[in-house]
């Protein structure tokens, strides 16, 4: 029996094509994945992300616990509501999951972790909490809706009360604020501006309907994947997992090495990997016909690699991919497509931001 979100009925009403997503019955699209993709790049789209796991970490040692748990350092978070992105690593330096953490104060934080890894993550959070004065509470009573695109904030704001409008006024990217019954964050997984909004589950349907009435287009997991790949954002389980170092997943920027005395889970292994050198995650661009896909082999001058994520980019009109390759890769590589080797260009793993190509 698959799990459903508080918005399941709304998806069916809208004629969504539903698929099983790690035990959740979720919309893959509502008719046209390409149209949904363009709506987010050009106007405003919304995603049901209620399957994500919301976890509150509170207690006298909440900060110390998260400093030990995460490769990125929550000590950087000084302002109320400021968020950061981090990997949660195992002792071998592999990625248990990637997540966002919001800082309310040094005794109160909120994490948003992936749904596919929920059980594993909860067990990991609990096991690492031993010896720390913290309580870890999952918050399934919230639904979560991501409203993304150049007009997303403006359209979402038509639903906000005066106090909520005031709370988000001038809010910079990567912040979250509790404003009356909504938790509103300037985060997302598309490379566009917008909000991720946590709403009490019993209000989710009416909130979704009000967004529809404001002209926000519902979008499924299909468009979510092409948007995040254009933005060069990793998908857990594909671009990295427990066997992959963040250094080999374009996540080096999420590791806080200083102060050297901060011990975090996986630090020793990471230091050895940094010393020895690892593979790296790069972007690939192919302007010929055909689509680069996950799992395709990549040949470079310094050895073999593999495509971790690949798709047709609706914004650019050709195929893009992310690939893990030896670190001294050249400007081009070869990819095996339909039994022949095709030369493709190597770029930084980011293709589109705020509706524009960054290639």
Curated annotation (Swiss-Prot):
One of its GO terms (molecular function) is transaminase activity. Coiled coil: none annotated. It catalyses: N(6)-[(R)-S(8)-aminomethyldihydrolipoyl]-L-lysyl-[protein] + (6S)-5,6,7,8-tetrahydrofolate = N(6)-[(R)-dihydrolipoyl]-L-lysyl-[protein] + (6R)-5,10-methylene-5,6,7,8-tetrahydrofolate + NH4(+). It comes from the Bacteria. One of its GO terms (biological process) is glycine decarboxylation via glycine cleavage system. One of its GO terms (cellular component) is cytosol. Its EC number is 2.1.2.10. The keyword Ribosomal protein does not apply. It holds the Pfam family GCV_T. Keywords: Aminotransferase, Transferase. The keyword Transferase applies. Belongs to the GcvT family. The glycine cleavage system catalyzes the degradation of glycine. The glycine cleavage system is composed of four proteins: P, T, L and H. This is Aminomethyltransferase. It comes from Alteromonas mediterranea (strain DSM 17117 / CIP 110805 / LMG 28347 / Deep ecotype).
